[in-house]
Design a protein with these regions (language model features):
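Short amphipathic recognition helices of helix-turn-helix/homeodomain-type DNA-binding modules
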Residues: 71-77
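A short, Lys/Arg-rich alpha-helix, primarily the initiator
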Residues: 1-24, 30-31, 70
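Short Gly/charged-rich anion-binding patches and loops
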Residues: 13, 27, 56-60
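DNA major-groove recognition helix of helix-turn-helix/homeodomain DNA-binding modules
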Residues: 53-71
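Core residues of bacterial helix-turn-helix
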Residues: 21, 32, 36-37, 65
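Recognition helix of helix-turn-helix/homeodomain-like DNA-binding domains
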Residues: 33-52
Length: 77
């Protein structure tokens, strides 16, 4: 996979997590704030659009969303 494809996949995975929970960008911003990560809605939108965010930020999002397990299988995201 190219780096561009990996960015797109990272973005798709996080967008799918939000969609399955029927959450909006503002909901993620609120959840991140509760775990000590301050991100504006526009910053979140930009990161998801570009797919350029660190794995640490992805982990923060997962923790904020209450996920305890992460798999890379498309069927289990």
């Amino acid at each position: 996979m190219t780096e561009e494809e990996l960015h797109a996949e990272a973005s798709r995975i996080l967008k799918a997590l939000l969609a399955r929970r029927q959450l909006k960008h503002a909901d993620l911003a609120d959840a991140l704030s509760r775990v000590g990560v301050n991100e504006s809605v526009s910053s979140i939108k930009g990161k998801l659009h570009r797919g350029t965010f660190s794995f640490a930020w992805m982990l923060a999002c997962c923790k904020a969303l209450g996920l305890s397990k992460i798999t890379l299988d498309d069927d289990s995201v």
